[in-house]
Amino acid sequence: TGSGDSHDTDDSCLDVRGHNNVVENIKADNCLFGLDFKQSNNNLIRGNEIRSKELDLGVRGDGLRLWYSNDNIVEKNKIIESRDMVAWYAHRNTFRDNLGRRSRYSIHFMFANDNVVERNQFYDNAVGIYFMYTEGGKVRHNIISHSTGATGMGIGFKEASGAIIEYNEIIYCGIGIGSDLSPFQPDSTIEMRGNRFAYNGIGILFNSETGGNNMVDNIFEGNLTQVTYGGRGDNN
Protein backbone atom coordinates (compact mmCIF):
# COMPACT_ATOMS: atom_id res chain seq x y z
CA THR A 1 0.00 0.00 0.00
CA GLY A 2 1.10 3.55 -0.65
CA SER A 3 3.30 4.30 -3.66
CA GLY A 4 5.10 7.53 -4.51
CA ASP A 5 3.35 10.42 -6.24
CA SER A 6 5.43 11.00 -9.38
CA HIS A 7 4.03 10.50 -12.87
CA ASP A 8 7.49 11.22 -14.27
CA THR A 9 8.92 8.08 -12.67
CA ASP A 10 5.71 6.00 -12.94
CA ASP A 11 5.58 5.39 -9.20
CA SER A 12 3.65 2.16 -8.65
CA CYS A 13 2.86 -0.39 -5.98
CA LEU A 14 4.26 -3.23 -8.10
CA ASP A 15 6.66 -2.83 -11.02
CA VAL A 16 7.22 -5.93 -13.18
CA ARG A 17 9.96 -6.32 -15.81
CA GLY A 18 10.03 -10.01 -16.58
CA HIS A 19 8.33 -13.02 -18.11
CA ASN A 20 6.39 -16.06 -16.84
CA ASN A 21 5.46 -14.62 -13.45
CA VAL A 22 2.34 -15.26 -11.38
CA VAL A 23 1.02 -12.10 -9.73
CA GLU A 24 -2.05 -12.95 -7.67
CA ASN A 25 -4.07 -12.03 -4.59
CA ILE A 26 -2.34 -8.70 -4.07
CA LYS A 27 -4.21 -5.80 -2.52
CA ALA A 28 -2.68 -2.65 -3.97
CA ASP A 29 -4.20 0.37 -2.26
CA ASN A 30 -3.36 4.08 -2.28
CA CYS A 31 -1.18 3.61 -5.37
CA LEU A 32 -0.47 6.15 -8.08
CA PHE A 33 0.02 3.31 -10.57
CA GLY A 34 -1.12 -0.09 -9.34
CA LEU A 35 0.49 -2.97 -11.24
CA ASP A 36 2.86 -1.84 -13.99
CA PHE A 37 4.13 -4.39 -16.53
CA LYS A 38 6.71 -3.26 -19.07
CA GLN A 39 8.15 -5.57 -21.73
CA SER A 40 6.77 -8.49 -19.75
CA ASN A 41 5.26 -11.52 -21.49
CA ASN A 42 3.37 -14.67 -20.51
CA ASN A 43 2.43 -13.53 -17.02
CA LEU A 44 -0.66 -14.57 -15.06
CA ILE A 45 -2.25 -11.59 -13.28
CA ARG A 46 -5.10 -12.94 -11.17
CA GLY A 47 -7.27 -12.10 -8.20
CA ASN A 48 -5.74 -8.74 -7.36
CA GLU A 49 -7.58 -5.71 -5.95
CA ILE A 50 -6.31 -2.31 -7.04
CA ARG A 51 -7.28 1.19 -5.91
CA SER A 52 -5.70 4.49 -6.80
CA LYS A 53 -4.81 7.38 -4.58
CA GLU A 54 -7.66 9.71 -3.68
CA LEU A 55 -6.96 12.17 -6.48
CA ASP A 56 -9.03 13.76 -9.21
CA LEU A 57 -9.71 11.28 -11.99
CA GLY A 58 -7.35 12.83 -14.55
CA VAL A 59 -4.31 12.84 -12.27
CA ARG A 60 -4.65 9.35 -10.88
CA GLY A 61 -2.34 6.70 -12.27
CA ASP A 62 -3.44 3.59 -14.13
CA GLY A 63 -4.62 0.63 -12.10
CA LEU A 64 -3.04 -1.91 -14.42
CA ARG A 65 -0.74 -1.17 -17.33
CA LEU A 66 0.64 -3.48 -19.99
CA TRP A 67 3.30 -1.71 -22.07
CA TYR A 68 4.99 -3.68 -24.85
CA SER A 69 3.77 -6.78 -23.01
CA ASN A 70 2.28 -9.75 -24.85
CA ASP A 71 0.43 -13.02 -24.19
CA ASN A 72 -0.54 -12.22 -20.61
CA ILE A 73 -3.69 -13.44 -18.84
CA VAL A 74 -5.47 -10.84 -16.72
CA GLU A 75 -8.34 -12.43 -14.82
CA LYS A 76 -10.54 -12.01 -11.75
CA ASN A 77 -9.04 -8.68 -10.76
CA LYS A 78 -10.93 -5.76 -9.21
CA ILE A 79 -9.88 -2.29 -10.34
CA ILE A 80 -11.83 0.38 -8.50
CA GLU A 81 -11.49 4.17 -8.45
CA SER A 82 -8.42 4.13 -10.63
CA ARG A 83 -7.76 5.98 -13.89
CA ASP A 84 -7.38 3.38 -16.66
CA MET A 85 -6.47 -0.20 -17.32
CA VAL A 86 -4.27 0.14 -20.40
CA ALA A 87 -2.66 -2.10 -23.00
CA TRP A 88 -0.34 -0.09 -25.23
CA TYR A 89 1.74 -1.85 -27.90
CA ALA A 90 0.60 -5.02 -26.17
CA HIS A 91 -0.70 -7.97 -28.20
CA ARG A 92 -2.61 -11.23 -27.67
CA ASN A 93 -3.50 -10.58 -24.04
CA THR A 94 -6.67 -11.98 -22.46
CA PHE A 95 -8.77 -9.94 -20.01
CA ARG A 96 -11.29 -12.26 -18.36
CA ASP A 97 -13.73 -12.06 -15.40
CA ASN A 98 -12.45 -8.70 -14.16
CA LEU A 99 -14.45 -6.00 -12.39
CA GLY A 100 -13.87 -2.33 -13.16
CA ARG A 101 -15.74 0.45 -11.33
CA ARG A 102 -15.65 4.22 -11.01
CA SER A 103 -12.62 4.75 -13.23
CA ARG A 104 -12.06 6.50 -16.57
CA TYR A 105 -11.35 3.75 -19.13
CA SER A 106 -12.03 0.21 -17.96
CA ILE A 107 -9.64 -0.93 -20.72
CA HIS A 108 -7.85 1.34 -23.20
CA PHE A 109 -6.08 -0.39 -26.10
CA MET A 110 -3.68 1.60 -28.25
CA PHE A 111 -1.57 0.06 -31.02
CA ALA A 112 -2.53 -3.24 -29.38
CA ASN A 113 -3.64 -6.11 -31.61
CA ASP A 114 -5.57 -9.36 -31.18
CA ASN A 115 -6.50 -8.97 -27.53
CA VAL A 116 -9.49 -10.79 -26.01
CA VAL A 117 -11.92 -9.21 -23.52
CA GLU A 118 -14.48 -11.66 -22.13
CA ARG A 119 -16.89 -12.04 -19.21
CA ASN A 120 -15.88 -8.78 -17.53
CA GLN A 121 -18.16 -6.41 -15.64
CA PHE A 122 -17.55 -2.69 -16.06
CA TYR A 123 -19.77 -0.26 -14.13
CA ASP A 124 -19.80 3.50 -13.57
CA ASN A 125 -16.75 4.28 -15.70
CA ALA A 126 -16.47 7.08 -18.25
CA VAL A 127 -15.68 4.54 -21.00
CA GLY A 128 -15.92 0.77 -20.93
CA ILE A 129 -13.53 -0.47 -23.63
CA TYR A 130 -11.70 1.69 -26.18
CA PHE A 131 -9.79 0.51 -29.26
CA MET A 132 -7.41 3.07 -30.74
CA TYR A 133 -5.23 2.25 -33.77
CA THR A 134 -5.73 -1.48 -33.27
CA GLU A 135 -6.21 -4.52 -35.48
CA GLY A 136 -8.16 -7.60 -34.47
CA GLY A 137 -9.53 -8.23 -31.02
CA LYS A 138 -12.57 -9.97 -29.57
CA VAL A 139 -15.03 -8.53 -27.03
CA ARG A 140 -17.60 -11.06 -25.86
CA HIS A 141 -19.99 -11.79 -22.99
CA ASN A 142 -19.21 -8.59 -21.07
CA ILE A 143 -21.56 -6.35 -19.10
CA ILE A 144 -20.89 -2.63 -19.56
CA SER A 145 -23.21 -0.36 -17.63
CA HIS A 146 -23.58 3.29 -16.65
CA SER A 147 -20.81 4.81 -18.76
CA THR A 148 -22.33 8.25 -18.54
CA GLY A 149 -21.32 11.89 -18.61
CA ALA A 150 -20.14 14.03 -21.52
CA THR A 151 -17.90 11.27 -22.90
CA GLY A 152 -19.88 8.29 -21.61
CA MET A 153 -19.42 5.32 -23.96
CA GLY A 154 -19.64 1.55 -23.60
CA ILE A 155 -17.25 0.56 -26.41
CA GLY A 156 -15.33 2.96 -28.65
CA PHE A 157 -13.29 2.67 -31.85
CA LYS A 158 -10.79 5.14 -33.29
CA GLU A 159 -9.14 4.04 -36.55
CA ALA A 160 -9.51 0.41 -35.47
CA SER A 161 -10.05 -2.63 -37.69
CA GLY A 162 -10.94 -6.29 -37.53
CA ALA A 163 -12.67 -6.41 -34.14
CA ILE A 164 -15.46 -8.83 -33.24
CA ILE A 165 -18.00 -7.56 -30.70
CA GLU A 166 -20.46 -10.27 -29.68
CA TYR A 167 -22.96 -11.21 -26.96
CA ASN A 168 -22.33 -8.19 -24.75
CA GLU A 169 -24.83 -6.28 -22.59
CA ILE A 170 -24.34 -2.54 -23.06
CA ILE A 171 -26.85 -0.69 -20.92
CA TYR A 172 -27.48 2.75 -19.43
CA CYS A 173 -24.57 4.40 -21.26
CA GLY A 174 -24.45 7.77 -22.95
CA ILE A 175 -23.41 5.99 -26.16
CA GLY A 176 -23.43 2.21 -26.48
CA ILE A 177 -20.83 1.89 -29.24
CA GLY A 178 -19.08 4.90 -30.77
CA SER A 179 -17.10 4.45 -33.99
CA ASP A 180 -14.77 6.96 -35.65
CA LEU A 181 -13.03 6.05 -38.93
CA SER A 182 -13.45 2.36 -38.17
CA PRO A 183 -12.82 -0.08 -39.71
CA PHE A 184 -9.74 1.79 -40.86
CA GLN A 185 -7.74 -0.73 -42.89
CA PRO A 186 -8.94 -1.34 -46.46
CA ASP A 187 -11.19 -4.40 -46.88
CA SER A 188 -11.40 -4.96 -43.12
CA THR A 189 -14.61 -5.18 -41.09
CA ILE A 190 -15.95 -4.77 -37.60
CA GLU A 191 -18.46 -7.46 -36.66
CA MET A 192 -21.19 -6.71 -34.12
CA ARG A 193 -23.50 -9.62 -33.39
CA GLY A 194 -25.80 -10.79 -30.68
CA ASN A 195 -25.31 -7.74 -28.46
CA ARG A 196 -28.01 -6.06 -26.39
CA PHE A 197 -28.15 -2.26 -26.41
CA ALA A 198 -30.65 -1.08 -23.81
CA TYR A 199 -31.55 2.28 -22.26
CA ASN A 200 -28.60 4.15 -23.75
CA GLY A 201 -28.73 7.70 -25.03
CA ILE A 202 -27.57 6.40 -28.43
CA GLY A 203 -27.28 2.71 -29.20
CA ILE A 204 -24.57 3.00 -31.88
CA LEU A 205 -22.97 6.21 -33.15
CA PHE A 206 -20.98 6.20 -36.40
CA ASN A 207 -19.00 9.43 -36.74
CA SER A 208 -17.84 8.48 -40.22
CA GLU A 209 -19.29 6.44 -43.04
CA THR A 210 -16.41 4.20 -44.01
CA GLY A 211 -18.60 1.10 -44.33
CA GLY A 212 -17.48 -2.35 -43.27
CA ASN A 213 -19.54 -2.50 -40.07
CA ASN A 214 -21.58 -5.71 -40.08
CA MET A 215 -24.41 -5.89 -37.54
CA VAL A 216 -26.34 -9.14 -37.09
CA ASP A 217 -28.87 -10.26 -34.45
CA ASN A 218 -28.36 -7.33 -32.11
CA ILE A 219 -31.17 -6.21 -29.79
CA PHE A 220 -32.00 -2.52 -29.40
CA GLU A 221 -34.46 -1.60 -26.68
CA GLY A 222 -35.30 1.59 -24.87
CA ASN A 223 -32.50 3.69 -26.37
CA LEU A 224 -33.34 7.34 -26.99
CA THR A 225 -31.79 6.92 -30.46
CA GLN A 226 -31.04 3.45 -31.77
CA VAL A 227 -28.40 4.16 -34.46
CA THR A 228 -26.95 7.44 -35.71
CA TYR A 229 -24.95 7.73 -38.93
CA GLY A 230 -22.94 10.92 -39.21
CA GLY A 231 -25.50 12.80 -37.19
CA ARG A 232 -28.57 11.26 -38.85
CA GLY A 233 -30.69 9.31 -36.39
CA ASP A 234 -32.70 6.14 -36.98
CA ASN A 235 -35.07 4.89 -34.32
CA ASN A 236 -36.52 2.10 -36.45
What is each stretch, according to the model?
Residues Y199-G233:
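Repeat-solenoid scaffold signature
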Residues A112-S208:
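Eukaryotic tandem repeat interaction scaffolds
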Residues D5-D15, N30-F33, L57-Y68, I80-D84, ...:
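Extracellular beta-strand/beta-solenoid scaffold signature
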